[in-house]
């Protein structure tokens, strides 16, 4: 997909082109990455980059906003349609900024929050001690059980003990279905707000392949990349008018200044693509691919956290299965042009920078038209490589096989044209 970039600044041009080449050559299994369409890239690289403004459509602090106002309104309308929401803020620069705005809107500094622990699959912004969410707020955690799944009775028990003002559900490395109705019951039992972070599963939610949190959560946030396959950024959704007003104030002026209009336009374009039938088929293929990918590892005796996946990702315990750390596994696979990320596993004894697992996601390679057969081949190659981590001869053979796969499935320019 990626065309060679030419710039007066040769240093940056060379690095951009090297990164484009890396993306073409590597098998991308990082669950938070995907390939946007050329249309999304055009919007993100458009003249909208030049336009500055503050505030919201019809209520700007700068002139000349008549066209960006319309773009932002279209993005809002499409986001609401995709998720069956009444209100959408499409300005957040990133998922972390969106989450920070939600904290600011609903909490006061020092208020308590309850989220999934990082090693169980939670996110930094869900109360981790080195994040703003753990620095400015009193954070408590729940974990998965020994089987790697959420225990809602235990979560209720913890919530009753700590009485959080906000409960967070939605994760960065959890492969099972999230029961938002159960979380609503828990939140109601302790008088807490419920915040659903669906950054990873939003594409699946759109396609009705995972239950939606709308109608259960007080507020919902998602990034616009990952399974949504849009530009980098985030949106915040709610059905509550008063919360919507608080969210708007928390985004601007609370956490951000001027919106990135080029990114809002790119979000709108990706929402347009997500409203098409092709997007639903893509999400269905993600589920099919991930199940086969996961099952192939299970068949080989590999320990998969939480068992068979029900979404677009899963985490394997490489320490138990291959006597490797996550860091070692990531480095070994990288030499063969397979990109993964090391990941903590529940009750991990290793630090996050080392970890005992690797997280595998299928969204990016499904965008390149990988089907079940390709993921079976890929699982077998990964398993071989990790079982013989010091066999350089084998690794060179695997690298050649990976090259064949990547060249057979180039990055696509668009996802709507059949030609």
Swiss-Prot record:
Membrane-spanning ranges: none
Residues bound to (6S)-5,6,7,8-tetrahydrofolate: 118, 122-124, 242
Annotated Pfam families: SHMT (PF00464)
Required cofactor(s): pyridoxal 5'-phosphate
EC number: 2.1.2.1
Compartment(s) where it occurs, according to its Swiss-Prot or TrEMBL record: Cytoplasm
Marked site (Plays an important role in substrate specificity) residue numbers: 225
GO CC term (a single one): cytosol
Disulfide bridge partners, by residue number: none
Modification type N6-(pyridoxal phosphate)lysine: residues: 226
Catalyzed reactions per annotation: (6R)-5,10-methylene-5,6,7,8-tetrahydrofolate + glycine + H2O = (6S)-5,6,7,8-tetrahydrofolate + L-serine
Keyword terms, alphabetized: Amino-acid biosynthesis, Cytoplasm, One-carbon metabolism, Pyridoxal phosphate, Transferase
Gene Ontology BP terms: glycine biosynthetic process from serine; tetrahydrofolate interconversion
Pathway named in the protein's UniProt entry: One-carbon metabolism; tetrahydrofolate interconversion; Amino-acid biosynthesis; glycine biosynthesis; glycine from L-serine: step 1/1
Main localization, broad class: cytoplasm
Reported function: Catalyzes the reversible interconversion of serine and glycine with tetrahydrofolate (THF) serving as the one-carbon carrier. This reaction serves as the major source of one-carbon groups required for the biosynthesis of purines, thymidylate, methionine, and other important biomolecules. Also exhibits THF-independent aldolase activity toward beta-hydroxyamino acids, producing glycine and aldehydes, via a retro-aldol mechanism.
HAMAP family assigned to the protein according to its UniProt record, in alphabetical order: SHMT
NCBIfam families linked to this entry: PRK00011.1
Binding partners and assembly: Homodimer.
Protein name: Serine hydroxymethyltransferase
Lineage of the organism: Bacteria, Bacillati, Mycoplasmatota, Mycoplasmoidales, Metamycoplasmataceae
């Amino acid at each position: 997909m990626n065309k060679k970039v030419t710039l007066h600044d040769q240093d940056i041009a060379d690095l951009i082109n090297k990164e484009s080449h890396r993306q073409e050559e590597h098998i991308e299994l990082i669950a938070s990455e995907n390939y946007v369409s050329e249309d999304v890239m055009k919007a993100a690289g458009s003249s909208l980059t030049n336009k500055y403004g503050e505030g919201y459509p019809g209520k700007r602090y700068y002139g000349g906003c008549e066209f960006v106002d319309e773009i932002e309104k279209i993005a809002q309308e499409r986001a609401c349609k995709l998720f069956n929401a009444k209100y959408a803020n499409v300005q957040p620069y990133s998922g972390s900024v969106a989450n920070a705005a939600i904290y600011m809107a609903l909490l006061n500094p020092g208020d308590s929050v309850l989220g999934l622990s990082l090693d169980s699959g939670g996110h930094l912004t869900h109360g981790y001690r080195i994040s703003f969410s753990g620095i400015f707020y009193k954070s408590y955690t729940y974990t998965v059980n020994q089987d790697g799944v959420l225990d809602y009775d235990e979560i209720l028990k913890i919530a009753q003990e700590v009485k959080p003002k906000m409960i967070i559900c939605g994760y960065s490395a959890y492969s099972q279905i999230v029961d938002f109705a159960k979380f609503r019951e828990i939140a109601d039992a302790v008088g807490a707000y419920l915040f659903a972070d669906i950054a990873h599963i939003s594409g699946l939610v759109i396609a009705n392949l995972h239950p939606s949190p709308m109608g259960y959560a007080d507020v919902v946030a998602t990034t616009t990349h990952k399974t949504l396959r849009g530009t980098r950024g985030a949106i915040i959704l709610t059905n509550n008018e008063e919360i919507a007003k608080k969210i708007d104030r928390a985004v601007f002026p609370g956490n951000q200044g001027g919106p990135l209009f080029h990114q809002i336009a790119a979000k709108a374009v990706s929402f347009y693509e997500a409203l098409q039938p092709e997007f639903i088929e893509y999400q269905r293929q993600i589920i099919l691919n991930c199940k086969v990918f996961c099952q192939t590892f299970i068949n080989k005796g590999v320990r998969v956290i939480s068992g068979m996946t029900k979404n677009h990702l899963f985490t394997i315990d490489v320490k138990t299965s291959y006597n490797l750390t996550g860091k070692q596994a990531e480095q070994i696979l990288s030499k063969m042009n397979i990109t993964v990320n090391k990941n903590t596993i529940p009750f991990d004894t290793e630090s996050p920078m080392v970890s005992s697992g690797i997280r595998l996601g299928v969204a990016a390679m499904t965008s390149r038209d990988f089907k079940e057969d390709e993921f079976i081949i890929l699982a077998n190659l990964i398993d071989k490589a990790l079982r013989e981590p010091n066999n350089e001869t084998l690794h060179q053979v695997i690298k050649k096989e990976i090259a064949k796969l990547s060249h057979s499935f180039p990055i696509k320019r668009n996802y709507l044209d059949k030609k």
